[in-house]
Amino acid sequence: DKPIRTEESLEGTVIYKKTTTFEVDGYTYQCDVDDGSQFVTLYNKENKLTYKDIVYKATGKIYIGSWNEKKVIEYNSSMSWQEDFIVDQAFTKAMADELGKREFTITMLLSPDTGKVMEVNFNFTTFSPYARVPLHVYREIEVKLKEQIHFKPGEVGKQLNYIMLSWRQKPQGKLPPLPPPGSLM
């Protein structure tokens, strides 16, 4: 008996185990691995801010946020929901099941002028199942976040060279489409 639905699962081997550049389908991603911690930073090679400090545009001084200061963005619950939805939908249900309860980190770098997503990067370890997720999944998340997400920069956010928003998520995955009624697979 064949399964009724087939869908992509995680790769059998670790994809992101050492510092490497990946060129796939017209886009280039950089995977940086810290040899000691095995911590992975995965990002579009075109990114320019991944390792840049957040600074005040006027002074060049490094920005150090605090819980009691004015907001860098105006919170928008529908945008936060949309971020989670985009991540969930990029993973198949089979992938999500294989990931178990483990989370990975998604970081968006926003324009201080428009609040739109300029860059995205991902963090996980070489020994987590996220190191076996195909590159096109991370690419889909990046593209959709850039297309669909924007926040209103706050008073402080407007003064910075970029705004960083980061969160950890355990993807739920999407179900594959059902076959048309009456068809047999």
Where are these regions (language model features)?
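Charge-biased low-complexity segments
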Residues: 2-185
